[in-house]
A protein has these predicted regions:
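Flexible glycine/proline-rich, aromatic-decorated loop/lid segments
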Residues: 25-33, 139-154, 161-169, 213-224, ...
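Flexible, acidic/His-enriched mid-domain "rim/lid" segments that flank
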Residues: 5-100, 110-112, 153-167, 171-182, ...
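Acidic/histidine-enriched ion/cofactor-binding microenvironments in catalytic or ligand-binding pockets
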Residues: 114-144, 221-273
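Intrinsic disorder at enzyme termini
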Residues: 279-339
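Acidic/polar loop patches that form or flank catalytic/metal-binding clefts of enzymes
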Residues: 12-13, 99-100, 177-191, 203-209, ...
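Short, basic/aromatic beta-hairpin or loop at an interaction surface
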Residues: 101-114, 209-226
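Conserved small/polar residues in nucleotide/adenosyl-binding loops
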Residues: 1-5, 341-347
Length: 351
């Protein structure tokens, strides 16, 4: 078929992705080495797809808050990593339109959390203790779209180091989610927003900050990604276009002790167009609280506190109508506003 259809004609092929057998057959012909044009078309979700993704995340948020209520009630009763994975699947399965998990659940307690893509099985499964963190990276396919979320939960009293590091990761998540940027930037330009707070403390994470997410397809899907390394071919960071959905997942991993990752899904939207150019922004799709008890509030500036409070207020507003009275009371507690620092200015201040 190749010979019949392509004799004397150039062939468009993505050399980084085709298999070696096809490459050998194409080698003697004229090859136009280009990314599959449908890749970008898939990545740029249309208005209906973005709206449906928002609906999927509401369902996911409802299921996740119900799971958090269960977690809060049972953390002292000897639950395991697999118990958490199974409970999340149970709650998601109750949602209309649920199809399946979008990937194998990552539930990692304590030192397991420092293994970036650890997944529990019967041999490795451990019981949570009343200390440290459990890192939970899970997702689902619904008829409306795909979700991918990571939350790291405190299992008891945390050390100052643990709370400080959680807060550094949170600062990165908030900064990237709040980005306002000129059209034409790639993930490589934006990555520093998520890492800056960690870098200032000599910390980092050895994975990308974000990956493209498909619409009821692959949970990892290009060409958009957010990583600072300047790659080539399939690793080249694409221009972030309106409609592209990308994960926002900074983290920090302390070998032998714990791991922290906080992941939301964000969609790129047009912000404004003026004499300086086209400006983009992100809208966060994920609707699940952060663990407010794991945050060192003193490390947040006033803008970060505002972002956190606004996010939690929105979570409460959207999810609360779908909960029973006890779950609502619980949600009110875990989305409570953090206090701002009110400065008393001198009477002769010109500010």
């Amino acid at each position: 078929m190749y010979k019949r259809q392509s004799k004397g004609r150039p062939i468009l092929a993505d050399i980084d992705k085709i298999n070696y057998l096809l490459y050998k057959k194409l080698f003697k012909g004229k090859i136009l080495n280009m990314v599959n044009p449908t890749t970008k078309m898939k990545a740029m979700k249309n208005e209906t797809e973005v709206l449906n993704e928002a609906k999927a995340h509401i369902k996911d948020g409802i299921a996740y808050v119900k799971f958090l209520y269960w977690f809060n009630q049972n953390i002292s009763k000897g639950i395991t990593e697999l118990d958490i994975a199974n409970k999340l699947l149970e709650e998601r399965s109750k949602m209309e339109g649920f199809i399946e998990e979008s990937f194998e659940a990552i539930v990692a307690y304590g030192s397991h959390g420092a293994i970036v893509h650890y997944s529990p099985d019967e041999a490795s499964n451990i019981e949570l203790q009343d200390k440290s963190f459990v890192l939970i990276d899970t997702g689902a396919h619904y008829l409306e779209g795909t979700t991918d979320i990571t939350r790291t939960l405190a299992c008891g009293e945390l050390t100052k180091e643990e709370k400080d590091n959680y807060t550094l990761v949170l600062k990165g998540n908030l900064a990237l989610g709040d980005a306002k940027f000129l059209y034409g930037l790639t993930g490589a330009n934006l990555d520093i927003l998520a890492r800056s707070a960690l870098w200032r403390k000599g910390l980092d994470y050895n994975h990308g900050t974000g990956h493209g997410v498909g619409y009821l397809m692959n949970v990892h899907e290009g060409p958009n990604n957010i990583r600072w390394r300047l790659g080539k071919g399939k690793n080249l960071s694409a221009v972030i276009e309106p409609g592209m959905i990308t994960s926002n997942e900074p983290g920090v991993y302390i070998t032998g002790k714990y791991g922290i990752r906080l992941e939301n899904m964000i969609v790129c939207k047009e912000r404004e167009k003026n004499d300086f150019g086209r400006f983009m922004e992100f809208e966060t799709l994920t609707i699940v609280p952060f663990d407010i008890n794991a945050i060192n509030i003193d490390m947040l500036d006033e803008h970060e506190k505002m972002l956190l409070n606004d996010y939690h207020k929105n979570v409460n507003k959207i999810i609360s109508p779908f909960l029973d009275s006890k779950e609502k009371e619980f949600l009110d507690r875990i989305t409570r506003a953090v206090s701002y620092t009110h400065l008393t200015l001198p009477t002769n201040s010109l500010v």
